[in-house]
Amino acid sequence: MMGIKTILRDKLRNAQRVAVLGIGSQLRADDAAGLLIAKELKTYLKDNKKRNQLKVFLGETAPENLTGQIKKFKPTHLIVIDAVDFHLKTGALRVVDIRTEAGVSFSTHRVPIGILRDYLYKSIYCETILIGMQPGSTEFCGCLSQGVRESTQAASKEIREVLKNFI
């Protein structure tokens, strides 16, 4: 299986403008994974000289509230990062083809990927890439699991390496 870095490089090959949308709740243990990665990327990119080509959005538990801002940015590609229950080992990462896995649900908000994809595509008109991380627990006020902690750090590093072309 290819790593996320290889897959992202391939999917972003013709990208002009990239938006990253982190989704999750810091109050629900491992559900915070997407949000934590996006926050790390936002910090890393704070001195980004090419802000017109790359922007990070923190969607938290209501990513649909940011569609206006994302639409205004006019990305050619949108990377969505969230905890997704694939029934895999805690911390496992997958780049999901949301055109074929429309029945998979996000871990806390339970919005099927297909519905979010259709909503984003109809309002933003861009290629959407989902990076999903398997949560161990989404318990309210729970702690981040070791597997998710390690995977968020590794994923942040790999995504940063791919996005270097845009900074």
Q: Where are each of the predicted segments found?
A:
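N-terminal catalytic or cofactor-binding beta/alpha core of small enzyme domains
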Residues: M1-P135, G142-F166
